[in-house]
Amino acid sequence: EVDRYWVVLAALEALADRGDIEAKVVAEAIAKFGIDPDKRNPLDC
């Protein structure tokens, strides 16, 4: 299921890939939103 947290995470990952934000921001979002980093990203399914 794609919810708002996965959408935000995908956007943050794209920004980090471009170098616009630090990777730690992505890690902080994962912790804050309680996202299981081992779970497959539903946007990629």
Curated annotation (Swiss-Prot):
Reactions it catalyzes: N(6)-[(R)-lipoyl]-L-lysyl-[protein] + pyruvate + H(+) = N(6)-[(R)-S(8)-acetyldihydrolipoyl]-L-lysyl-[protein] + CO2
Record keywords: Oxidoreductase, Pyruvate, Thiamine pyrophosphate
Class of the enzyme per the UniProt entry, highest EC level: oxidoreductase
UniProt superkingdom: Bacteria
Enzyme Commission number(s) of this protein: 1.2.4.1
Disulfide bridges in this chain: none
InterPro entries on file: Transketo_C/PFOR_II
Molecular function GO labels: pyruvate dehydrogenase (acetyl-transferring) activity
Known cofactor(s): thiamine diphosphate
The protein's assembly and partners: Homodimer.
Function as written in the Swiss-Prot or TrEMBL entry: The pyruvate dehydrogenase complex catalyzes the overall conversion of pyruvate to acetyl-CoA and CO(2). It contains multiple copies of three enzymatic components: pyruvate dehydrogenase (E1), dihydrolipoamide acetyltransferase (E2) and lipoamide dehydrogenase (E3).
Protein name, as recorded: Pyruvate dehydrogenase E1 component
Organism: Azotobacter vinelandii
